[in-house]
């Protein structure tokens, strides 16, 4: 991960990066604002619209953290400027999905309906056409929260392997 950590991150227009004294990285852009605590061992600086990360030594753990925080920052910057999107198809006979605000109502073949509440940062759309499988499209500026929500939805009814 140390090679990833050495690469600078160019900031797109409309994205501001602030580094506080207690090593909290704040990225603000047109789609939202994200915060990330960074290990004090990892140094950060912004020069001429470019974010740089540095490390004090070449120990294995330090190299890993160097690349980790650089990758997290890159995802934050991409999220507040472009956003992230996941598309899931619900495959099964009689399966239904309906979104109302941030609550999804799913009928996944159980004897009861499942109500799944999403984080407020996630925007969801469902498309259900007659004769086709329902499609869930989720968008957010936070990649971690979006991936976690997608994994939880998938775990409600695992795909049939056959």
PLM regions with names:
Residues 1-162:
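Structural preference for solvent-exposed beta-strand-turn elements
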């Amino acid at each position: 991960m140390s090679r990833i950590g050495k690469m600078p991150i160019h900031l797109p227009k409309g994205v501001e990066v602030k580094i506080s004294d207690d090593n909290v990285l704040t990225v603000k852009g047109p789609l939202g604002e994200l915060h990330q605590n960074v290990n004090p061992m990892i140094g950060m600086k912004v020069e001429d619209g470019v974010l740089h990360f540095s490390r004090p030594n070449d120990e294995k753990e330090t190299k890993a953290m160097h690349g980790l925080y650089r990758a997290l920052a890159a995802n934050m910057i991409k999220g507040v400027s472009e956003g992230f999107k996941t598309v899931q198809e619900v495959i099964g006979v009689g399966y239904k999905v309906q979104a109302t605000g941030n609550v999804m109502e799913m009928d996944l073949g159980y004897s009861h309906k499942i109500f799944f509440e999403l984080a407020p940062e996630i925007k969801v759309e469902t498309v259900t056409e007659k004769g086709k499988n329902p499609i869930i499209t989720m968008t957010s500026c936070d990649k971690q929260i979006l991936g976690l929500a997608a994994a939880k939805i998938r775990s409600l009814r695992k795909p049939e392997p056959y």
